[in-house]
């Protein structure tokens, strides 16, 4: 988690969360239903986000800025991202799963405790995280290997 403030930079999930339920208060439940989450067409969401970024850039006189989308949610929707951000360059920063999965599970536990307030089945939460993000990685790999995929680089 990080500091929040009205004038501070924020992750893309806030602007994208206007269109799809990827905010922490809802997404921690949706990980339990990957078939639902993976079926969403978020092309319109990315178009809306692109427009918001363009507005921010124009307002600051920095139209040529590069933007970084860092949420792991983008793994699921690379095919839609590619449709909207046609000149994007994807740099996929790989973290060791033995570090990243516990980190995600801890984050999702915090969300569940904040919004559900009940006892959390940690074993079930761990299984859900492993299954969901494993499927997300496979989907992203497939999307980036597809004909016509954007230029991308893997960084470890």
Question: Model-flagged regions — what are they?
Answer:
Residues 39-65, 71-156:
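PAPS-dependent sulfotransferase catalytic domain
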């Amino acid at each position: 988690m990080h500091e929040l403030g009205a004038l501070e930079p924020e992750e893309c999930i806030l602007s994208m969360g206007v269109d799809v339920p990827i905010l922490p208060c809802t997404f921690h439940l949706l990980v339990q239903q990957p078939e639902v989450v993976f079926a969403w067409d978020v092309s319109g969401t990315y178009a809306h986000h692109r427009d918001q970024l363009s507005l921010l850039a124009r307002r600051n006189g920095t139209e040529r800025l590069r933007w970084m989308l860092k949420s792991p949610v983008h793994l699921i929707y690379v095919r839609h991202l590619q449709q909207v951000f046609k000149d994007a360059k994807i740099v996929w920063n790989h973290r060791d799963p033995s570090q990243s999965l516990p980190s995600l599970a801890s984050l999702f536990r915090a969300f569940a405790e904040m919004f559900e307030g009940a006892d959390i089945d940690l074993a079930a939460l761990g299984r859900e995280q492993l299954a969901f993000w494993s499927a997300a990685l496979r989907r992203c790999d497939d999307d980036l290997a597809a004909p016509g995929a954007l230029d991308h680089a893997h960084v470890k």
